[in-house]
Amino acid sequence: MLVIPAIDLRDGRVVRLRQGDFAQSREFARDPLALAGDYAQAGASWLHVVDLDGARAGTPRQIELIGQLAQTTLHVQAGGGVRDLDDVQRLFDVGVARVVIGS
């Protein structure tokens, strides 16, 4: 069995949206890197990251932070605003192992 924890990023913080509504977001954690470390310490080997700013804008916005997460011991799969091969390549260039392209 494989359990993959997920982090939704907005303005550099981990948030939870209520039913996908950006107007109803709640900060879950200030430091995404610390939370990723907690997941790794709990035994996770993968991390799913969603760039909510990117999803809203139509192009990834949290590339630098996602790259920092990819430099941890976790394998990172990321998405949010990925619309073309340039976006995919930018994520691979910062160390992401898998890229999720959504509608």
List each model region and its residues:
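Conserved N-terminal beta1-alpha1 strand-loop-helix module at the mouth
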Residues: 1-74, 82-86
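Glycine-rich phosphate-binding active-site loops on the catalytic face of alpha/beta enzymes
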Residues: 82, 89-103
